[in-house]
Design a protein with these regions (language model features):
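Short, small-residue-biased leader/transition segments that mark boundaries at the very start
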Residues: 2-6
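Membrane-embedded transport module
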Residues: 16-76, 90, 97-291
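Basic, alpha-helical nucleic-acid-binding regions used in initiation and control of genome expression
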Residues: 87
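Transmembrane helix-loop junctions at the membrane interface of multipass transporters and ion channels
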Residues: 152-161, 315-332
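C-terminal membrane-solvent junction of multi-pass transporters and transport-like membrane proteins
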Residues: 205, 209, 288-310
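Hydrophobic alpha-helical transmembrane segments in multi-pass integral membrane proteins
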Residues: 223-227, 309-324
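Small-residue-rich transmembrane alpha-helices that serve as helix-helix interface/gating elements
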Residues: 333-346
Length: 347
């Protein structure tokens, strides 16, 4: 009887973790009940529906279209010819490797190992890749905001850009190539499966991302502008001479005579700028994860960690041996230590 059908379907649902003791009977329907129920009523129930048994091909297709009307992204699995209408209607059709030719042609993806676990792994990797792209955008746009504003402010104040063309080439190499490799190589994280599905209308740059990009970018610019002002008034020969009170006094001091920035000061500025972006790459790694920037470093040491070391080594070699080509002079180990520790405060 129908009662036995319901009981059997609930038991199957319980065994696969779909049906729980708290679920009410209205979360299960037969194909006949589904067909006889008008769309208006089904639209109110479809998000709570867990099991539909004895469904015909048109019932499956109708279910897909009702879910899509609720702005859901629908994936359908099937292996038979009767699954073709639903596979065609869904945004993602998944056919089994041993399914019929009709089902495979109607689907977008064929699961060769016939395992539902492959679907969840694919979703996990897709979500992880999407998050990695967002991390790269956060990192890249922050550098763009900082670099562009530094150049613009310099132009308005009638001073030359403190970063030369060759230095900007190195910054762009970090921004486009190394950071892309580092952030794209981050391993997948099973916790992304706990995130709610995105709407099809969601933009890849979210509001938290925009706030982070503008907030951190403007903060970097404010600090770097103050650093330029300080160097123009202080004429230091070692970073140990840096004075925080002098930094704040010189911030808006446009009346005291200024001097041209020395090669040493330009080298300091260039290195501080790059190291700020270096640490910001760690911030981008941790963006929207509620974890430390150094979490799971062991899992990503071969990719992210290696790229981070390459950036540090490249910056050291450029400053130490770059000379006139990069408009730099070598820095002492004390300077390197102070810059490394000071810029890490952005974490």
């Amino acid at each position: 009887g129908l009662g036995d059908v319901y009981k059997r379907q609930r038991e199957i649902g319980r065994q696969i973790g779909l049906w729980t003791e708290e679920d009410t009977p209205d979360r299960l329907m037969t194909g006949v009940e589904f067909e006889q129920t008008p769309d208006a009523e089904l639209l109110d129930r479809v998000m709570d529906l867990k099991i539909m048994c004895r469904a015909r091909p048109m019932d499956k297709e109708r279910l897909v279209k009702l879910l899509q009307k609720k702005d859901q992204v629908v994936a359908v699995t099937g292996d038979g010819t009767n699954d073709a209408p639903a596979l065609n209607a869904a945004q993602v059709g998944l056919s089994m490797g041993d399914g019929t030719t009709v089902a495979k042609e109607a689907s977008a993806i064929t699961i060769l190992d016939n395992s539902f676990m492959s679907i969840s792994r694919a979703v996990m990797w897709g979500r992880s890749l999407y998050r990695n792209i967002q991390r790269f955008i956060v990192f890249q746009m922050t550098i763009n905001v900082a670099a562009c504003l530094i150049v613009l402010i310099g132009a308005f104040l009638g001073t030359e850009s403190p970063l030369t063309v060759t230095q900007m080439l190195w910054v762009n190499l970090i921004m486009d190539t190394f950071a892309a490799l580092a952030l794209a190589s981050l391993p997948s994280d099973e916790r992304v499966m706990q995130d709610p599905p995105r709407k099809t209308t969601d933009h890849i740059i979210t509001r938290p991302m925009g706030r982070n990009i503008l907030g951190v970018g403007i903060l970097f610019v404010a600090f770097l502008f103050g650093l330029l002002q300080y160097f123009k008034h202080a004429d230091i020969t070692s970073l140990t001479q840096f004075s925080l009170s002098g930094y704040f006094r010189s911030y808006l001091d446009f009346s005291t005579p200024e001097h041209e920035l020395t090669g040493y000061e330009l080298s300091l500025f260039f290195t501080i700028f790059v190291l700020l972006q270096f640490w910001n790459m760690f911030n981008a790694k941790a963006f929207n994860t509620h974890q430390s920037a150094f979490a799971r470093m062991g899992a990503s040491i071969g990719g992210f960690g290696l790229v981070a070391l390459l950036i540090l080594a490249g910056q050291y070699l450029i400053v130490t041996f770059g000379g006139k080509m990069f408009n730099v002079v070598p820095l002492s180990w004390t300077d390197w230590g102070l810059i490394f520790a000071g810029t890490s405060l952005v974490l």
